[in-house]
């Protein structure tokens, strides 16, 4: 995005006074990335059900606003999960910038305690309903499941966005660590295996919060 642009748009480094929306309090590592690349960070207050969407809807009328960071489930550091209404309002956004992107970091998608786990509707299908197929990148990883910094990661998005990302990534890596991918598949086997593994984490952590 910084050097090549997104889907034919101007590279972000050429956009003067570029801005990025940051729900606060939030994840400092996210904010540090966009700060490093010269973005003005705009604070968006977190409410009890997610970011202040009225403020987001107003700010994206500026075409120098290029994106927003989101941790939609158990958001750092408050633990808030976005409501269905907030997710739908995200999916219905009409930003001035064609290359505005929601960076949807679903880092805690499998991190409930016991049978109690917040549910969140699928942002990608909601975007499709609003003809905003390209507006979101959704990320997840096993960093907080298996090995911090040495697990596996995934991104979900529209076919156009994924083709765009593949075009960037082919210059930075020959391919993923397939042995590590196989290691994870053989250990977990399926989604039930992931759930069972996470309950072991829960058994260790839950007493600290009781």
PLM features: residue spans?
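Walker B catalytic acidic pair
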Residues: 105-106
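Hydrophobic "anchor" residues on beta-strands that sit immediately upstream
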Residues: 67, 101-102, 137
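Conserved core of the PLP fold type I
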Residues: 1-98, 109-130
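Short, cationic motifs built from Arg/Lys/His that form the positively charged side of catalytic pockets
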Residues: 86-87, 151, 208-209
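Arginine residue identity/basic-tract feature
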Residues: 18-19, 29, 88-89, 101, ...
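Conserved core segment of the aminotransferase class I/II
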Residues: 125-206
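Serine/threonine-rich low-complexity intrinsically disordered regions
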Residues: 11, 61-62, 96-97, 161, ...
